[in-house]
């Protein structure tokens, strides 16, 4: 505010702009609360800065700050590439986040009433905010119905294609390797949880391995020298009594541990190398081919001219303590940690989300599907996965109780702010295991790019919904 008042003293011919700005800012705190006033102040000062430049010397370049640095009125990220987030911007983001309202209560009518009781005028800004909130609400629901929701017919056809692939693999594996200790394979993923968005294009084929309880045990990643929560080692036990070869899966053991990479290689030789997919595809009227390269074993199934389904083949271990481990490597350290199995929280996270929605008829699942669609349709946000988005909602649910359908716009904005905060901190805890950092497989540059994109969207959230 001082910056505004100081500039005002030296400008007598600004046609009352300074007076108007001073009046708006002096009353903003009463009407909008501390957070709203801070954001209004930043925006107003930026506008006034441009206005002052236009009045001063339009033909001359803007003078640089004597210190060689831009002032906070000119954020260092203005005009920079959207793919680069420098240190100055991080500081701006951190400072701005601290001034953002922490809850929607800052914008509720009672805040306006308190302002009126202190002598403030009925705020046009409050009415405009309500209109904007209503507009965002309408856009979110329109986006949900028009872009997010998948027609039931498309989902049904995709599920049938996935089931056909599952049946072929089951028959082949039982015929080729009848002694391989496997439980019944099954299909899983968002296609079967009604959480898939935009197109029905992905499914997971879970392949549960049977391990002898007295021969194998899991060691949490945080208890190893690697110290990676969310992953586990599966160690071979009792080798002195049951030597190598006593378990079918000893052939996939590396350094005394069951290697998910070796397990995947066994299945890859069978699924990608031994099965005659062109012949099977001609019978099923599909075009089937293995995806190469891929971090997991994936099949691409073209079941219609313009529709493709990707089926991930995921070996699964269900340990004695109930922990589910899948053969999906660490994204950034697959070579260094090739013996690590990934702990899967998807089933428990989805169940928790649905239980919360059932308790209060909430819109958490709707929020999740909208965010998933936004990330799927915006390449700059593609690195945010379903687990991160689900946990952002679960974490916010611990602080915010109103998840009614009418609060969709407010919760959506809170989620954007929460995601920016997690990215700025470089950490998002998993609600089912607080030791797990769900951002640990993102590079610093990716975190910066995601944070930049979401931070820019805070001032224009509808831009996230304007996709091709």
From Swiss-Prot:
TM region positions: 30-47
Dimerization: region residues: 50-196
Entry GO CC: mitochondrial outer membrane; mitochondrion
Compositional bias per record (Polar residues), positions renumbered to this chain: 91-108
UniProt-annotated stretches for the region Important for interaction with DNM1L: 161-170, 235-244
GO molecular-function terms, A-Z: nucleotide binding
Protein name, UniProt field: Mitochondrial dynamics protein MID51
Protein source organism: Danio rerio (Zebrafish)
Gene that encodes it: mief1
